[in-house]
UniProtKB/Swiss-Prot annotation:
Residue ranges constituting the bHLH domain according to the UniProt record: 645-735
Organism of derivation: Neurospora crassa (strain ATCC 24698 / 74-OR23-1A / CBS 708.71 / DSM 1257 / FGSC 987)
Pfam family, one: HLH
CDD domains given in the database record: bHLH_ScPHO4_like
Protein name (database record): Phosphorus acquisition-controlling protein
GO molecular function, one term: RNA polymerase II transcription regulatory region sequence-specific DNA binding
Polar residues bias locations: 387-401, 459-472, 637-646
Keyword Nucleus: yes
One GO-annotated biological process of the protein: regulation of transcription by RNA polymerase II
Highest classification ranks of the organism: Eukaryota, Fungi, Dikarya, Ascomycota, Pezizomycotina
Task of the protein: Factor that activates the transcription of structural genes for phosphorus acquisition.
Top-level taxon of the source organism: Eukaryota
Length: 801
């Protein structure tokens, strides 16, 4: 059907077309009540871009296929005489096709995921007659279709965006479940330093591949949040990470950036490998720093060699001090430096250690000493200093290999005698065979170079012991303070670098030269050895030089060790001398111990008075009671009254106690018998005789005491409290014994009385029966007096009790 077939009169035949079309479009926009639209609609979405430029006939064909699959009238056929016909057809066609295709796509997604109800169209819409769909007027139909299509497309766009977000989230979680790396103890031990770099690199690569940064940021946030939650959940079920964490602790100190999959973008270049590489790089840097510290000694080589060419002693001092400082700074680096350095030191010095080479060097130095006196001492000294400081291969005389020569000679502690052997340098004296001037210069100037080695600097505390022997040399005086200044720095280095054999061996070299050439010296020129060195001047060094050097060196070693001990001994002796001097002084302390005044030669009595005054005034209670207080110190007025009341109350209580004691003693003295000695002696004698004896000695002693008391008292009354108490004690004991005897006799009397009553009852019964009362009465009369006596003596008391 062409567009010309549509006529205006056709619209007049359908007056209800407008309302019917509105109802149909509302039904079409009702998404929940729509049927299956895909069965009735079939569009090609790929021609959307080209449809904007198509002819009106293509739009009419698409509209015909949309609303009239079996043929019929067209809703979008342009009216004759209208200007909107050319614009309506292509736009309507494109928008409808786009909406239908989006609807079909969402229906498939919803059938798969069952997340949203299906969007379908109603079946009656397909069977709607074309007559009812046709609008009443062309303008109203066009407006209604445009509004309906716009609303439908807006709804479809919103649903499409929502569905796209859901699909992205589902795809993201599905990919995360496949790519998440569970945390392990190794991954937990990693440092989080390099994880930020990896995370940043991964995000940049993802941005280049995925798209704009706006989409990447929410994904990163979701990724970080999700992996952190999952790591905490997984870590609660993993075994113990460390002994300090209990299985019940679910919150572990985890570095979450390493759990993000972006950190594990490659199995080979993992953060663990990169972290290890960083650590190795740091270690390499440390090794570089340590190795860089060792060449400091090598840098000292040129100035040390330049000393041989430059004569002034100031340069030697400066280089020596710099060498000592460099050693002090690079002591730790020397420890951790490669082993090749000490090996090179040994190999470099071995050809120079032969005694022949040393003799040649000495011979070469001897003529130079004769020519140039200021330069000659620096030649061997600079070489020895370079040997100790820089280990030079050409100009070093440091005889390390002479350690082998010293061992058969049985050297005691090797490191101690270095400076002494270096200062005298007797090997130059006999071979030089010159005047005494170079000999005097040699022991002085070699001492300048000897402190180059740290061990020699350590033992420079005793040059004061050697300075008196070497008087002619004027170089010792300026150098001794230098040695003293440089003494403690090598001390710490030596303790720290004790395992190093090099400084110890270099110190052994110079002592080793002495015994060998001292052995040759007395044989060739016996007169020369005494002047050059103070050690040779000793009488012990003359008989055998080879054996004399070890004897001298232990002495020097002991002297070095004892120097710190001699000082305190000297101090102690001074202290003792001061104590003895105080004792030898007039000794005021015992006489006037509290006095502060030191010496009062003529006023000893005045000093005693002052002491008594001080003792009297020292009592703070007395001052307070008298009101004499120290200026600036005020005491409350109640304190004096309290003190007085305390003292008076104490005195009263003490006096009352004494009065009670005295009154009690007086009362005891009155209760005591006037002549208790005889009665007590008789009582004791009677008691002992009655008990069977054996207490005569105790009774005699008591009688002696009582006689003495009688003599003292005169009238039997004790003259002292002690005698009164003693007499009271004896009297109490006597009374106790008498009471015990009386009780014993009373018991015996009661027992006899009971027996007599028993016998008397039996006798009366037998007498009445037999009639022999006269015969039985005679024994009773004989026995009755005994019973009466007993009753008289103790029976009465027993009955009373």
């Amino acid at each position: 059907m062409n567009s010309s077939s549509w006529s205006a009169p056709d619209h007049s035949h359908h007056p209800a077309l407008h309302t019917a079309a509105d109802d149909d479009f509302h039904q079409y926009l009702d998404i929940n009540d729509m049927g299956d639209l895909s069965d009735a609609l079939d569009f090609d979405f790929r021609d959307f871009g080209a449809d904007h430029h198509t002819a009106p006939h293509a739009g009419r064909h698409a509209a015909d296929h949309l609303l009239h699959p079996s043929g019929g009238e067209h809703l979008d056929t342009p009216m004759t005489g209208t200007d909107m016909s050319m614009i309506l057809s292509p736009v309507d066609h494109a928008m409808l096709r786009h909406g239908v295709q989006q609807q079909q796509h969402h229906q498939q997604q919803q059938h798969q995921q069952h997340q949203m109800p299906t969007i379908t169209t109603t079946a009656p819409y397909q069977n709607a007659p074309t007559a009812l769909i046709q609008p009443s007027t062309p303008s109203e139909a066009i407006v209604n279709t445009i509004d309906a299509q716009i609303q439908f497309l807006q709804q479809q766009k919103l649903h499409a965006q929502h569905q796209q977000l859901q699909e992205q989230q589902a795809a993201f979680f599905a990919s995360q479940q496949n790519h998440i790396v569970p945390p392990t103890p190794q991954s937990l031990e990693l440092t989080a330093g390099s994880s930020q770099n990896y995370y940043a690199q991964s995000t940049l690569s993802d941005q280049h591949h995925s798209g704009p940064q706006k989409q990447q940021q929410p994904q990163q946030a979701i990724d970080y949040r999700y992996t952190r939650i999952k790591d905490q959940h997984d870590m609660s079920f993993t075994p113990l990470v460390s002994p300090a964490v209990t299985p019940l602790e679910t919150h572990f100190p985890i570095d979450t950036p390493f759990a993000v999959p972006g950190a594990y973008f490659s199995p080979l270049t993992s953060p663990a490998l990169h972290a290890q590489n960083d650590a190795l790089g740091i270690i390499d840097q440390r090794l570089g720093m340590m190795s860089g510290s060792s060449p400091r000694e090598m840098e000292l080589e040129p100035p040390a060699m330049s000393q041989a060419s430059v004569s002034p002693g100031d340069l030697a001092r400066k280089t020596r001090k710099n060498a000592v400082k460099a050693r002090a700074k690079s002591g730790s680096g020397i420890k951790q430096s490669p082993i090749s350095k000490p090996i090179r030191r040994k190999t470099a010095t071995t050809p120079m250690l032969n005694p022949q080479a040393l003799n040649q060097l000495v011979e070469n130095a001897a003529p130079s000493q004769e020519r140039q006196q200021p330069l000659t001492p620096l030649i061997p000294t600079s070489s020895s200093s370079t040997a100790g400081v820089t280990d030079s291969e050409n100009g070093s005389i440091s005889p390390e290999n002479l350690n082998d020569v010293v061992l058969p000679v049985e050297m005691p502690p090797p490191p101690l005698p270095k400076p002494r052997s270096a200062k005298p340098s007797p090997f130059l004296a006999p071979q030089a065979s010159g005047s005494a001037v170079p000999i005097n210069l040699q022991p002085g100037r070699p001492g300048i170079a000897s402190p180059a080695t740290p061990a020699s600097l350590m033992k420079l505390s005793s040059p004061s012991n050697r300075n008196p022997s070497v008087v002619g040399t004027g170089s010792h005086d300026p150098m001794d303070p230098d040695h003293i200044e440089n003494f403690e720095l090598p001390d710490s280095i030596n303790f720290s670098s004790a395992p190093k054999p090099a400084p110890i061996i270099t110190t052994l070299g110079t002592p080793a030269l002495d015994p060998l050439q001292k052995a040759a010296a007395p044989l060739q020129t016996p007169g020369l050895p005494p002047p050059p060195s103070p050690a040779v001047a000793k009488p012990l060094a003359l008989p055998s030089a080879a054996l004399s050097s070890p004897q001298l060196k232990p002495d020097s070693a002991h002297s070095l060790k004892r120097t710190p001990q001699l000082a305190p001994m000297g101090r102690s002796s001074k202290k003792r001398a001061s104590v003895t001097s105080i004792q030898m002084s007039p000794a005021l302390r015992p006489k006037i111990s509290p006095s502060i005044k030191p010496l009062l030669p003529g006023g000893s009595a005045g000093a005693e008075d002052a002491a008594s005054i001080l003792l009297a005034t020292k009592s703070n209670y007395q001052r307070i009671l008298e009101g004499n207080t120290v200026p600036g110190v005020s005491y409350p007025s109640e304190l004096s009254t309290n003190l007085t009341s305390k003292r008076t109350s104490h005195k009263i209580a003490e006096q009352g106690r004494r009065n009670r004691i005295n009154s009690a003693l007086q009362e005891i003295a009155t209760l005591l018998p006037k002549a208790p000695a005889k009665e007590g002696g008789d009582g004791d004698g009677d008691g002992h005789s009655s008990s069977g004896g054996g207490g005569g000695s105790g009774g005699a002693d008591r009688e002696d005491k009582r006689e003495k008391d009688k003599d003292k008292a005169g009238g039997g009354i004790p003259n002292s409290k002690a005698s009164t108490v003693e007499m009271a004690i004896e009297y109490i004991k006597q009374l106790q014994k008498e009471v015990a005897d009386a009780n014993k006799r009373a018991e015996e009397a009661e027992r006899k009385l009971v027996e007599m009553k028993m016998q008397g009852g039996a006798a009366t019964g037998s007498g009445s029966s037999v009639g022999d009362a006269g015969d039985l009465g005679t024994p009773t009369t004989e026995a009755n007096p005994v019973v009466d006596e007993d009753l008289k003596s103790g029976g009465g008391d027993a009955m009373d009790e």
